[in-house]
Amino acid sequence: MIKKIIYLAFLLPLAGNAQTTVIKPLVKQPTAFAIITDNQTYANTKDAMHQYKTAVEDDGLATYLISGDWQNPDQVKQIIIKTYQECPSLEGLVLIGDVPVALVRNAQHMTTAFKMNEKAFPWDQSSVPTDRFYDDLNLKFEFIRQDSVNHQHFYYKLTEDSPQRLNPTFYSARIKYPEKKEGDKYAAIASYLKKAAAAKADKHNQLDRVFSFNGASYNSDCLIVWMDDEKAYMENFPLAFGRQMGFKHWNFRMKHPMKYKLFSELQRKDLDLFMFHEHGMPTGQLINDELACTDFNNRYKMLKSTLYNAVMSHVGKRDKDTLRIQMQEKRQVNEVFFKDLDNPKFWEADSLHYADERIVTEDLMKRNLSTNPKMIMFDACYNGSFHENDYIAGQYIFNDGQTLVAQGNTRNVLQDRWTIEMIGLLSHGVRAGQYNKLIASLEGHLFGDPTFRFAPIEANTLSTDITIHKDDKAYWKNLLNSPYADVQSLAMRMLADADTQKELSPLLLKKYRESGFNTIRM
C-alpha cells in the first residue's frame, strides 16, 4: 500500500555556498528517482516541475525534487551522493535546465570510438562531455579547471586509481533546451514537463509500432547487415511483427532524397519507437549519399559539383582564378567546364541538392516539425551534443509533438557494433533509463524523461526488480526460462554481474549454446 509521508523541504549549505532545496517524496515506493534542476529553472517552471514529480510518483517511483544555485559539478554530485545514502533504492535521476557539464579527460578508453590527442587539440574538442560524472559513483575524478568561455563547462581528469570500466550506479537523462532554438526556454521546458506528465496517464500503450532507418554509409552500406537486423528485431518487438505495418525497415537506397518521406513518418501519431541508424554531427543527420552515377549526365553533374566546391573551399587563402587554372590542369578539363563557377543559379541548385541529403536542426525549426514517436534513437556521432547551443536530439523533444525521450551521443561513436543490444526490454515495461544504463558508454546519453516506459507484453515487475533484486541470483535464474529473448538476456546479464566468483560460467555457456534466440547468442 502506498503510504503518505510528510511533505518536507529543507535547505542545505553546500560547498561554494550553494543554497539547495530538497523536496522529499510524498509517497513511499520500493524504488526512487531524483529530479535535479537549477534554482532559476525551478522558479520559472515550478508548477510544471511539480506536475512531473507527481506523475512520476504515481508511476511507481518515490521522487525527490532538488534545486540549487550550482557553481560546479561537484556540488551537484555531493547532493546526489547524499540522496543515495539516504535512499539506497534510488534508481535514476534527470538533470533539468542549467546543470553544470563535466568534460572528462584521460578516459577515452571508455568511449566506443572517440580518440583525440589531448595534448595537441583544444580542451573543448579533446574532452568528453559526460554525465557518467553524476551517475557512476564508482569512478574517481580530479578537478582541473573551469572553461574560460563557457562557465557551465568544467574539466575533470579520470584518476589512475579509479575503476577503468563503466558501471553506472543509476540511470540519468538531460532535459536541456537548445539555446539556438530561441524563444522562452523556461516556457519550453515547462511545456515538455507537462507533456511528459500527461503521457504517464496512458497505461496501455504497448510497443507495437516501430520504424528503423539505415542512412548512407552506415555499417559500410552493407545490405546483408541491414537485412539480418530484422532477425533481432523480430525478437525485440514481437507485438510489432504481429500486426500489419507494425514494423517498417527502410534503407536510404529506397529514395533520393529520403528526408521528406522520413518527415512524414516522424509525424505519425501511432508510432512508438523510431530508430535512426546513420552518421551525424551536432546539428545534422546524414540521410542520403550521392546518387549512383548510372549515365554520363549524372557523372558530369557530380564531377562539376566536386571540383567547383574544391576550388571555392580554398578561396580566401588563394586567388580564385589561380585555383581554377590549377584545377583545370590537374583534372584535365577545359575552361568551359568552369563557366558556371560564378553563376548564382548553379550554387543555388547545388546547395539544395546537398541540403536534400541531410536533416539539420534548421529543417526542424523552419518547418516547426512536430515529431510523434514516443522514443527516438540516434546512434550517430554527435547527435546528442547537449553541451552545444544546438543539438539534434534536443530539437526532437522540444516541439509540439509527442516525443518524450531521445538517445544520442556527445562524441563520435562506433557504428560497427550491436547498437540495438537489450532494446527489446522496452517491450516488457522496462524504463528507458534502465535500458540505457545497461548499454552505457562515456558519450551515450538520454534526453527527456528517463522514467518513460511502454506497457509490457505481459504484466510483470521487471522495472522494480532490476533494482531491488539486483544481486538475487535465484530470481534471475528463474527468468532464464522466460519465453522472451530480451528477458532471458537481462537475466544472463544480471547473473554475470552478480557472479563475482565466476561460478555461473557453465550455466551461462549452456544457455548460450542451446538457446534458439539470435539475440541470446549475441
Q: What residues fall within each predicted segment?
A:
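Cysteine-dependent hydrolase recognition
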Residues: 19-522
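Bacterial Sec-dependent N-terminal signal peptides
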Residues: 1-20
